[in-house]
Amino acid sequence: MEGGCKVIITTSREPSKKTLELVNDLVNSLPGTSKIVRGKKSFITLLEEAVACGARYIAFIWERRGMPFALLFYDVINREWKPYMLKISGIKTRREFPVFISRRPPAKSAVIVDLSEGEVGDIFTEIFGYPILYSLDAVRGLFDTVVLIRRTDGYLVELLGSDLGPRASSIRIKKVVYRHV
């Protein structure tokens, strides 16, 4: 990966602690990602930093009323927004799990296991570039992070460790919204 990162993860301005914790968990769990602290930076400044890093995409976590609300993607090379937005209906941080989950060392490998066989797995594969499988049995102990996508009312995206136990926050996606860009 050129420059050490393929995807930059950032937030809207002045994010809440919960959103920052989600960003930190994602960066620690997903290889090839890094974060940019937004602060008061303009969109152009974010693009310049992404180009300097060698990133292909920027993942924005938008928030509303202090909670992550949507995940949007910007293609740095083609200079255009991706035509989909993942609406987040809730997240569960490491602190909210019933057992203590310590922060693990940064992941070096990842795989997507899409049990829902829906569009979220394809979107994650396109953005992050991880291989996609449709069975959980084949991945135990082979990857540092397993991105498990299950169908609920929407989708549930869980970041699991190599032992298939929780590694980081889980994200509940209400729906995928396709928009005209």
From Swiss-Prot:
Keywords: Ribosome biogenesis. GO terms for molecular function: rRNA binding. One of its GO terms (biological process) is rRNA processing. It comes from the Archaea. InterPro entries: Brix, Brix_dom_Rbsml_bgen_prot. Residues 5-181 form the Brix domain. The keyword Cytoplasm does not apply. Gene3D superfamilies: Probable brix-domain ribosomal biogenesis protein. HAMAP family: BriX. Probably involved in the biogenesis of the ribosome. This is Probable Brix domain-containing ribosomal biogenesis protein. It comes from Pyrobaculum aerophilum (strain ATCC 51768 / DSM 7523 / JCM 9630 / CIP 104966 / NBRC 100827 / IM2).
